Swiss-Prot record:
It comes from Homo sapiens (Human). Residues 487-506 have a biased composition (Polar residues). There is a cross-link at residue 343 (Glycyl lysine isopeptide (Lys-Gly) (interchain with G-Cter in SUMO2)). Residues 96-173 form the RRM domain. GO terms for biological process: eukaryotic translation initiation factor 4F complex assembly; formation of translation preinitiation complex; regulation of translational initiation. This is Eukaryotic translation initiation factor 4B.
Length: 611
């Protein structure tokens, strides 16, 4: 409802008090009022009951300073009532002195007399700083000729003077003496004003003489407050006057209470930022200090704290300083006595600490990377040499075995030469050429099988030299015995022996059956393998073939025997290890004669078919 009234008022509409109270639910009187009263506070002076605590904030001074009962309006602005002062505090005889606080620095006696115009003011005193006589302390005193002028001056509390809200209060003789003799100045007044206007602070009910200062740097304010307010608090003025300044903070030209509250909160926050937040005092005088806007105000405040010499707090602090001054001369004596004996230990400890600080890695030593790299390279080189030696040793062991393909190839070359010689001397038919071709193929296949079984790792090396072997063997020296000479000398003997051999089977059986060679072939093959000779092959031949074929075969057999002996000599000479020599020689000889036996069977079969 109050908000609606405010809105109407802002629009320029006015409302009577009775209507306003009726809307608010209060009990209004039965009398009627003018629609536009000059001062509704005069009309509600004797009004009893609940009254609205919300006030209009007008720019004009229509509702200014009417006396209102504070019990009826507990939170009314100060501008709506006269100051409620305990008359017991008022002086009974002149001088009637009023204390003026929160004065601007540029204030003069004439400006103060102008502020209290219409009042019987007799004198004005403005104390100055002892260190700087040109600078005011921020407070003063005004003496009035009569008590009514003093009461009127007290009603101007929290009025504006030079952009500051000054504090007007009653000053007794004890306060004046304390201010003048001890040069306490405006700090005491400031703290006393804060105590009076701060509704959050808890007042002290005992006098200054009963208790020492309680709150550190602000103890001087407590002293003055205790001495200044003890009587009126004890007389029951505590509930009256102390609660009054809580509402007196809002006094200035009908200003709205809520608006002033916001500024008060801002001033408290600002003052706490300045550094006075430790004090349990509200806004009031301190808030007006902030309006002054001068940093010198706070600097002077702290300077005066340092200059004060009247309080027991200062005496106590001076005693502390004296004890502190006596302390330092004794400290070196106490410190020098124990240091004289363990001086070396301290030096050793310092050196150990310095060494620890120097070696941030503790006991670790630096690593020579170059030496480490050399060691690693040497080790790797040794390992490589060792591996190379291990690879070379198997090569040396395998060298004797690598000679086997060479003597086999020589053997095959000797056979081929003997065969070519015998074939060139023969005048046989195409059956001989077919037998030679089959013999070569069987020899090659058998040699490949034996080589693969005996040496798997050397099989690739043995195959490539075959096409190159005729180039290597071409310049070889001729054999010890000439095969042509031996062939020309041996045929008559061989023919005789063959004739005698041929007679033995004919005498036993008469005629030779045509199927007999094929039946006796396997038996002859076994005899050839056991004996290691191919001489019985001549028994199967026909006597009508002539000495040419028989001599050619005998010569071929003898050349094979000679080649086998040569191969055995060549194998036994270069091989240093006997365990490897024996199985190699047996296997090679077995494979060689097996090939010859197969060739012999092929010849016998060919002859049988030819017959």
């Amino acid at each position: 409802m109050a908000a609606s009234a405010k809105k109407k008022n802002k629009k320029g509409k006015t409302i009577s008090l009775t209507d306003f109270l009726a809307e608010d639910g209060g009990t209004g009187g039965g009398s009627t009022y003018v629609s536009k009263p000059v001062s509704w506070a005069d009309e509600t002076d004797d009004l009893e009951g609940d009254v609205s605590t919300t006030w209009h904030s007008n720019d004009d001074d229509v509702y200014r300073a009417p006396p209102i009962d504070r019990s009826i309006l507990p939170t009314a602005p100060r501008a709506a009532r006269e100051p409620n002062i305990d008359r017991s505090r008022l002086p009974k005889s002149p001088p009637y002195t009023a204390f003026l606080g929160n004065l601007p620095y540029d204030v003069t006696e004439e400006s103060i007399k102008e502020f209290f115009r219409g009042l019987n003011i007799s004198a004005v005193r403005l104390p100055r700083e002892p260190s700087n006589p040109e600078r005011l302390k921020g407070f003063g005193y005004a003496e009035f000729e009569d008590l009514d002028s003093l009461l009127s001056a007290l009603s101007l509390n929290e009025e504006s003077l030079g952009n500051r809200r000054i504090r007007v209060d009653v000053a007794d003789q004890a306060q004046d003496k304390d201010r003048d003799d001890r040069s306490f100045g405006r700090d005491r007044n400031r703290d006393s004003d804060k105590t009076d206007t701060d509704w959050r602070a808890r007042p002290a009910t005992d006098s200054f003489d009963d208790y020492p200062p309680r709150r550190g740097d602000d103890s001087f304010g407590d002293k003055y407050r205790d001495r200044y307010d003890s009587d009126r608090y004890r007389d029951g003025y505590r509930d009256g006057y102390r609660d009054g300044p809580r509402r007196d903070m809002d006094r200035y030209g009908g200003r709205d209470r809520y608006d002033d509250r916001g500024s008060r909160d801002y001033d408290r926050g600002y003052d706490s930022r300045i550094g006075s937040g430790r004090r349990a005092f509200g806004s009031g005088y301190r808030r007006d200090d902030d309006y002054r806007g001068g940093g010198d105000r706070y600097e002077d405040r702290y300077d005066r704290r340092d200059d004060r010499s009247w309080s027991s707090r200062d005496d106590y602090s001076r005693d502390d300083y004296r004890r502190d001054d006596r302390g330092p001369p004794q400290r070196p004596k106490l410190n020098l006595k124990p240091r004289s004996t363990p001086k070396e230990d301290d030096s050793s400890a310092s050196t150990s600490q310095s060494t620890r600080a120097a070696s941030i890695f503790g006991g670790a030593k630096p690593v020579d990377t170059a030496a480490r790299e050399r060691e690693v390279e040497e080790r790797l080189q040794k390992e490589q040499e060792k591996l190379q030696r291990q690879l070379d040793e198997p090569k040396l062991e395998r060298r004797p075995r690598e000679r086997h393909p060479s003597w086999r190839s020589e053997e095959t070359q000797e056979r081929e030469r003997s065969r070519t010689g015998s074939e060139s001397s023969q005048t046989g038919t195409s059956t001989t050429s077919s037998r030679n071709a089959r013999r070569r193929e069987s020899e090659k296949s058998l040699e490949n099988e034996t080589l693969n079984k005996e040496e798997d790792c050397h099989s690739p090396t043995s195959k490539p030299p075959k096409p190159d072997q005729p180039l290597k063997v071409m310049p070889a020296p001729p054999p010890k015995e000439n095969a042509w000479v031996k062939r020309s000398s041996n045929p008559p003997a061989r023919s005789q022996s063959s004739d005698t051999e041929q007679q033995s089977p004919t005498s036993g059986g008469g005629k030779v059956a045509p199927a007999q060679p094929s039946e006796e072939g396997p038996g002859r093959k076994d005899e050839n393998k056991v004996d290691g000779m191919n001489a019985p092959k001549g028994q199967t031949g026909n006597s009508s073939r002539g000495p040419g074929d028989g001599g050619n075969r005998d010569h071929w057999k003898e050349s094979d025997r000679k080649d086998g002996k040569k191969d055995q000599d060549s194998r036994s000479a270069p091989e240093p290890k006997k365990p490897e020599e024996n199985p190699a020689s047996k296997f090679s000889s077995a494979s060689k004669y097996a090939a010859l036996s197969v060739d012999g069977e092929d010849e016998n079969e060919g002859e049988d078919y030819a017959e």
